[in-house]
């Protein structure tokens, strides 16, 4: 599975291995609080991923079938709207394989970071206890997520998650691994704010901070879900 995480126009790709790692108790609780136990109710998720002043990408995803609909632009700025099954990715066009699907993986991690890290299973997760917040006042429990030094497009990437007493991420610091085939920030520091519930899912919709010292903002808009037994979209609120 290819995993991505972007803050600039460049795409930041997670390392990939299949070995599951033990999770500390705090991360296991976060996994539940962010919606794991009810994720099976989700039939469709719709959202727009935005990097302020740079781009917007709109997605509709059916988790049970892995059917994806994308609306946005390609790397040259041409409008694109298409639907494809991820189960048949190898037979898709170069546009889908090289641009659209990597963008989906990236944006979906921003949407469901805690769940994606847990499902993936390759990262080492460590509870480092209470630490000073990198941006705000006070302190929070620092949980470090580190990907393997080999394998994937961006090996060795590390995330420091600053988690409050409510098990919600408040801020994070990203350290780029430095190797791999994709360009990405060396240092990214940002908030994890504007939490909303979309059905059973807990989602942070606003991230403000700096990428390699430059002000940056990533935010999610128009988030909604359809759950089993309902034909109506439930807007995040």
Where are each of the predicted segments found?
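Flexible, processing/modification-adjacent segments and terminal tails
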Residues: 21-28, 82-155, 180-184, 236-237
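Positively charged n-region of N-terminal signal peptides that target proteins for export
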Residues: 1-4
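Sec/Tat signal peptide C-region and signal peptidase I cleavage site
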Residues: 16-20
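N-terminal mature ectodomain segment of secretory-pathway/periplasmic proteins
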Residues: 23-98, 119-121, 126-131
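A general structural signal for short secondary-structure boundary/capping elements
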Residues: 60-62, 91-96, 116-119, 188-192, ...
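Bacterial N-terminal signal peptides
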Residues: 6-15
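Gly/Pro-enriched, hydrophobic low-complexity segments
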Residues: 137-235
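Tryptophan-centric aromatic hotspots in well-structured domains and transmembrane helices
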Residues: 39, 61-63, 110, 159, ...
């Amino acid at each position: 599975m290819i995993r991505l995480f972007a803050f600039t126009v460049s795409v930041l790709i997670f390392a990939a291995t299949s070995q599951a790692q033990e999770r500390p108790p705090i991360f296991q609780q976060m996994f539940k609080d962010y919606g794991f136990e009810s994720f099976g109710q989700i039939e469709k998720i719709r959202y727009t991923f935005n990097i302020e002043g740079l781009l917007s990408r709109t997605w509709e995803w059916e988790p049970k079938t892995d059917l994806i609909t994308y609306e946005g632009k390609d790397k040259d700025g041409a409008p694109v709207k298409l639907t494809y099954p991820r189960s048949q990715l190898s037979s898709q066009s170069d546009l889908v394989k090289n641009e659209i699907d990597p963008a989906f993986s990236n944006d979906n991690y921003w949407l469901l970071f805690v769940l994606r890290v847990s499902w993936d299973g390759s990262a080492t997760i460590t509870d480092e206890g209470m630490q000073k917040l990198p941006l705000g006042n006070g302190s929070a429990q620092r949980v470090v997520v580190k990907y393997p030094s080999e394998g994937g497009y961006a090996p060795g990437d590390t995330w420091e998650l600053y988690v409050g007493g409510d098990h919600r991420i408040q801020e994070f610091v990203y350290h780029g691994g430095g190797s791999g085939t994709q360009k990405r920030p060396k240092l990214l520091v940002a908030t994890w704010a504007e939490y909303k519930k979309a059905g059973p899912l807990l989602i942070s919709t606003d991230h403000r901070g700096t990428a390699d010292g430059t002000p940056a903002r990533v935010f999610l808009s128009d988030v909604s879900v359809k759950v089993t037994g309902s034909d109506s979209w439930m807007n995040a609120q």
